[in-house]
């Protein structure tokens, strides 16, 4: 901490993670919090959602604007990695040095938006099946009512990706990986308290360890 440059590189990611945790508690509009809590409090569906919530750092339980995390961006990155070798234009672009990498990164960001919108809609449908939106036909005439929810969740993903890139540029390490890991760490106390990891079936613990080690190795 005596070196100003190093101190800034360490403190900046911490500040951005504080912002991330704040955003994770900002709910999307139009949510019945009592119904959401009831679904998470019990039943097999609640356990499934609780496991998914582990990787969002509590954002799914709050159905916050950060409920999707940065996973749409991860999906977009994987898609681009698969497309570059098979599309001649992208393959040529990848060989143009920094300019090509910037263009591919830009395309990755563009693809992230529709993926986030689709995943946001899918997540809301999943919660409807769990009983949170029983009074609303999300596929019928009431569909416009959930448009603000979907847009806010997609916007949350875009914001988190931006935070991750700021951490990468101005901090230490890969910002996207740090945000994912921070989300997992933030969800651990609640998962342990609920006894998820302490169950006789060790599948949950093994899965958690494997995913955590994968993220750290990125």
Spell out what each predicted region is.
Residues 1-94, 98-218:
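N-terminal cationic and glycine-rich segments that engage phosphates or anionic surfaces
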């Amino acid at each position: 901490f005596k070196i100003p440059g190093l101190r800034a590189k360490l403190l900046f990611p911490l500040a951005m993670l504080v912002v991330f945790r704040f955003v994770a508690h900002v709910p999307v509009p139009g949510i019945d919090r009592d119904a959401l809590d009831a679904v998470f409090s019990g039943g097999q569906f609640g356990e499934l959602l609780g496991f998914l919530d582990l990787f969002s750092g509590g954002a799914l339980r709050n159905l916050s604007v950060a409920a999707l995390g940065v996973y749409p961006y991860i999906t977009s990155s994987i898609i681009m990695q698969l497309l570059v070798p098979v599309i001649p234009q992208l393959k040529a672009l990848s060989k143009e040095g920094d300019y090509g990498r910037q263009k591919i990164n830009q395309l990755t960001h563009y693809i992230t938006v529709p993926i986030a919108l689709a995943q946001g809609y899918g997540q809301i449908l999943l919660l409807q099946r769990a009983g949170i939106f029983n009074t609303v036909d999300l596929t019928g005439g009431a569909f416009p009512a959930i448009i603000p929810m979907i847009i806010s969740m997609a916007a949350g993903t875009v914001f988190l990706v931006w935070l991750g890139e700021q951490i990468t540029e101005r901090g230490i390490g890969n910002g996207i990986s740090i945000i994912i890991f921070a989300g997992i760490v933030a969800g651990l106390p609640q998962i342990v308290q609920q006894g998820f990891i302490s169950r006789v079936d060790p599948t949950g613990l093994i899965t958690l360890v494997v995913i955590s080690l994968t993220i750290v190795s990125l």
